[in-house]
Amino acid sequence: MELKDILKEGAQGLNIEITDAQINQLIKYKDILLEWNQKMNLTAIEEEKDVMIKHFLDSLSCIQSKYLKREGKMIDVGTGAGFPGVPLKIALPGIELTLLDSLRKRISFLEEVCAETKLGQVDFVHGRAEDIGQSKDYREKYDYAVSRAVAALNVLVEYCLPFVKVGGYFICQKGPQIIEELPDAEKAIKVLGGEVVEQISVDLPFSDITHHILVIKKIKQTPSKYPRKAGKPSKEPIK
């Protein structure tokens, strides 16, 4: 099966509309990703077909949330190689996207991806979530925070919820372990001003992978002491 067919049929399987032009943007993204991956560690997934499924379709599955609209301000926290933020921006061009990562080289890669795929309204921020989340330029400025980061949920919410404005949403992608992590994260979610409003189980097309999407609504402001200093959330999670 051709790569464009994997994307087209996979998107249909997820009930997501995607145009030929958007498919071409994603394929261009894949080319740049695999080229840069030769010189720096961006992804362990190197087969073209797997990039389509495990990176692109997985990222696009966030669109299954009834709370994610076609426009608004979004920040991808700890974006790494751009997932899920860049595929979401390609599929939802009305989104204003901020990509946050702590590694300068990854930001340089993302700048090239967005230039080559002609993505506008993208802001690149080099820094740690704990520091940027305390900046008045970014704190509680976003309709959506998204993350596919590997931290435990009670840590991830401290990284992400401070960026979300009251009435906005944190859309978190995790594996099956999210079911076990949720009870441990309930206090952190509440303390940081959030409330779980949606849980979705996603069977990823062309794979045997099941992922989960957790949507947390920001119902009140995050107390000013959060996020705590860099390293503190992961060493001493809110419990």
UniProtKB/Swiss-Prot annotation:
<comment type="similarity">
    <text>Belongs to the methyltransferase superfamily. RNA methyltransferase RsmG family.</text>
</comment>
<feature type="binding site">
    <location>
        <position position="148"/>
    </location>
    <ligand>
        <name>S-adenosyl-L-methionine</name>
    </ligand>
</feature>
<feature type="binding site">
    <location>
        <position position="78"/>
    </location>
    <ligand>
        <name>S-adenosyl-L-methionine</name>
    </ligand>
</feature>
<keyword id="KW-0698">rRNA processing</keyword>
<keyword id="KW-0808">Transferase</keyword>
<keyword id="KW-0949">S-adenosyl-L-methionine</keyword>
<dbReference type="GO" id="GO:0070043">
    <property type="term" value="F:rRNA (guanine-N7-)-methyltransferase activity"/>
</dbReference>
<keyword id="KW-0963">Cytoplasm</keyword>
<feature type="binding site">
    <location>
        <position position="83"/>
    </location>
    <ligand>
        <name>S-adenosyl-L-methionine</name>
    </ligand>
</feature>
<dbReference type="GO" id="GO:0005829">
    <property type="term" value="C:cytosol"/>
</dbReference>
<dbReference type="InterPro" id="IPR003682">
    <property type="entry name" value="rRNA_ssu_MeTfrase_G"/>
</dbReference>
<feature type="binding site">
    <location>
        <begin position="129"/>
        <end position="130"/>
    </location>
    <ligand>
        <name>S-adenosyl-L-methionine</name>
    </ligand>
</feature>
<dbReference type="InterPro" id="IPR029063">
    <property type="entry name" value="SAM-dependent_MTases_sf"/>
</dbReference>
<dbReference type="Pfam" id="PF02527">
    <property type="entry name" value="GidB"/>
</dbReference>
<comment type="function">
    <text>Specifically methylates the N7 position of a guanine in 16S rRNA.</text>
</comment>
<protein>
    <recommendedName>
        <fullName>Ribosomal RNA small subunit methyltransferase G</fullName>
        <ecNumber>2.1.1.-</ecNumber>
    </recommendedName>
</protein>
<keyword id="KW-0489">Methyltransferase</keyword>
